[in-house]
Amino acid sequence: MHLPHAAGLMPTALALALVVTTSVAAFPTSASAAEGQLPAAVAPARSVAAADDEKSVYEARFTGLAMGTIVSAKLYAADEKTAAGLANRFEEKVAAYETLFTVRGDGPLNDVNKNAGVWRMVDCRIASLVAQAKVVARDSDRAFEPTIGPLVNVWKIGFGGHSRPSDADIKAALRKVDYTKIAVDETPGACRIRIDPGQSIDLGAIAKGWIGTALASDMKEAGATSGIIDLGGNVSLIGSSPAGVDWRIGVQRPDAERNTVMAVVEASGVSVITSGDYERKFESGGRTYGHILSPVTGEPATTDLGSVTIIDADGARADGWCTALFAAGSEKALALAQREKLAVILASSDLKTLWVSRSIAPKVTVLDKSMKIQVVP
């Protein structure tokens, strides 16, 4: 895939803008949902600039469209050549990971789904992520389900769906949703996956978290001393900011316009990921239907949570558990977060309460003074 770009050199101040984590999760989750949703090529804008002449820190910036969302990065290095290399490397890796996890064309996941019932060889990174998704499904009592694909295809929320499917269609899809039917063989160099006929694997609620962590690791190996990667609201951080302090990440208010912040979390070297149903939904018959589906009822999850934010070094873990906790509701989510030792910020659906894990409470500033703050274990 050719990725046209624009590059230039310009002076810039070392000012750290607030980056907002949101619930948008537009990674195509099924072949039918993805069809026609993305342009054939990503058209990123890149630049390299001296971020701080006195300290000889250079900033590489990247912005483009990939995985159905806006991808951006600010990457810092000690010299201009390394910074320029970071911009190129980031572009290459984004394209590679999109190809790895695509559900379109002859992508490996699409091959597994099209050949349900037989073993299919896959990249071992895919096998590892599917195995991790199965663990989250098991430990969350199926509040997260990597075989949700048939339900996603029926509802198409965020992919053109604007009405409730028939009961018959929902029941038929539900019969195909069962993570225990996924078989994963992680033999090094010979990884493979098998699913039952009619099933399809959907990594839309975990893949971007994995990709964010992978990109951060790749950029560190390529010479980045610091950086911030934003995959449509899923934020992954490389170390601390160039100024040597934590990054400041805003948590979006669920009932407001994009970039309206209700809290700020200070963090370094982790992923900050948010789930909610406020950005992908439709209204029909006087009801609002969100995109996070229940594998038990087949309907959009009924929850008393407005959003869930998780801070974790493992982006895939944060991404998968965000979806699980949101669908589980506040009471079960708080119990699961404590058991799994997850650092969370949970907002109630009425936005009257914000639950914050004790481990991160000193790093969280609540901007909405109307919300009651509860620090939890």
Regions flagged by a language model, labelled:
Residues 2-377:
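Mature catalytic core of soluble alpha/beta enzymes
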